[in-house]
Amino acid sequence: MAVRIKLKPGREKSLERRHPWVFSNGIHNVKGKLEAGDTVDVVAHDGHWLGRGAWSPESQIQVRIWTFDREEEIDREFFKRRILRAQAGRDDLIREQGLTGYRLIAAESDGLPGITIDKYANVLVCQLLSMGADVWRDTIVDVLAELYPDCAIYERSDVDSRKKEGLASTMGLLHGTLPEMPVIIEENGIKIAVDVTKGHKTGFYLDQRDNRAMAARFVKGKSVLNCFCYTGTFGLYAAKAGAASIENVDVSALALDTARLNMRVNGLNDDNVHYNEADVFKLLRQYRDEGKTFDVIVLDPPKFADNKSQLNGACRGYKDINMIALQLLNPGGVLLTFSCSGLMPADLFQKIVADAALDAKREIQFIERLSQASDHPIGSAFPEGFYLKGLVARVW
C-alpha cells in the first residue's frame, strides 16, 4: 500500500480545485513510513484520493503535488512527459520572437513544483527549490541530457528558499561542458550577454522580454532613465529604437560592464549612453533636488517583499520611489514601473502608483498593464504564479 497522508476535515477543497500545495496545518495524519522527498498519496478526511506529491517535512508546504491523475506514476517518464509538454507549449513563441533564451519549465505552472529550468542558447540552467525536486535531480538531468543533447546543464539552486525545505544552497555543472561565459542569447532580433554562473536568478530576467519590446514604443527621440538596469536591456531596446539619450543606473559595476558589452555585441554606438553606478533611491532624490528631468523612466526594482510581514514596508517603498520618479518626468512623459513580488496584488500596486501621483502632484493615466512573458505561464489553479506586475503611465 502506498504511503498516505490524510487531510483534516474541509482541507481538501484547494486540492479539488487542483492547487498543488498541502500545508502542514492541514494534515490530519500520515500512514506509513516517509523520508524527505518521498512520493506520497494525499487523501481527504473521508478517504477519497486527491493527488500524489512529494513529502517535505521541514517545510510549511509539506506536500507539493506532482499529479492529480491517480493512474500516473512518478518516474522518469513522468518528468519526460512534463518537459516535452512544456517545450511544445513554447515552440510557437520561440519561432515568433526568434528566441534562443527562454523559460522551459515554470515550476508549479508547468506541473513540476519547485523546478525552474531556463534555456540560454546551449546551456540549460536548473533551480531545484523543493525537497521533491532535489530528490529527483539525477532523473531530471538524465531526461534533459536526452532531450537536449547539445546542451550543458548547470544548477543555480543558490537561493535562500531552499533553507525552508531543509536544503543547502548549491550550484555547479551537472552535465556536459560549460561554454565560456557569457553566452549570447537572442530575442526579437537583439543579442544579450548572459553569465549563468554569476548573474541574477538563473543569469537573466527572461520574464521582462515582452515589456522591453513594448517600452521601445515610447522612446524614439526621448531621454530615458533606466533604473535598476542590471545588464541594461531596457536601455538596449531603447538605443535600437532611437532614444536621444539613455542613462543606465545600477549599484553593480559588473552589471554595467555587461550593459556596455550588450551595446557592443549589437553593433550600437553608446556615445549617448551614460552608465551610472549608483544607489537608485539616492540618485532619484539628487536629480529631483537638481531639477533634472526625463521623458521616459523605467523602474524595475528588486523584490521588496519576501513574506507577508514585509508587505506594508514594500508598499511604502514602492510609493516613495514612484513618487520621486513621477516628479522627474516631463509633461507627457512615460513611467514604466514594475513589482516582481508575488505577494503584491496587481490592484494594490496600481493604487500605490496612483497615490504616489497624488503626493507628487502629477496627473497620470494608466495606458498599459503588464505581466511576465508568456514562457512564464500562470497555472489556472496557481495564482501565485502571477508575480510580475507592471504599469505604463502617461504623466502630465
UniProtKB/Swiss-Prot annotation:
Enzymatic reactions: cytidine(1962) in 23S rRNA + S-adenosyl-L-methionine = 5-methylcytidine(1962) in 23S rRNA + S-adenosyl-L-homocysteine + H(+)
Highest taxon in the source lineage: Bacteria
Sorted UniProt keywords: Cytoplasm, Methyltransferase, RNA-binding, rRNA processing, S-adenosyl-L-methionine, Transferase
Localisation: Cytoplasm
Parts forming coiled coils: none
Record Gene3D superfamilies: PUA domain (2.30.130.10), RNA methyltransferase domain (HRMD) like (3.30.750.80), Vaccinia Virus protein VP39 (3.40.50.150)
Role, per record: Specifically methylates the cytosine at position 1962 (m5C1962) of 23S rRNA.
HAMAP family hit by this protein: 23SrRNA_methyltr_I (MF_01857)
Listed name of the protein: Ribosomal RNA large subunit methyltransferase I
The gene coding this protein: rlmI
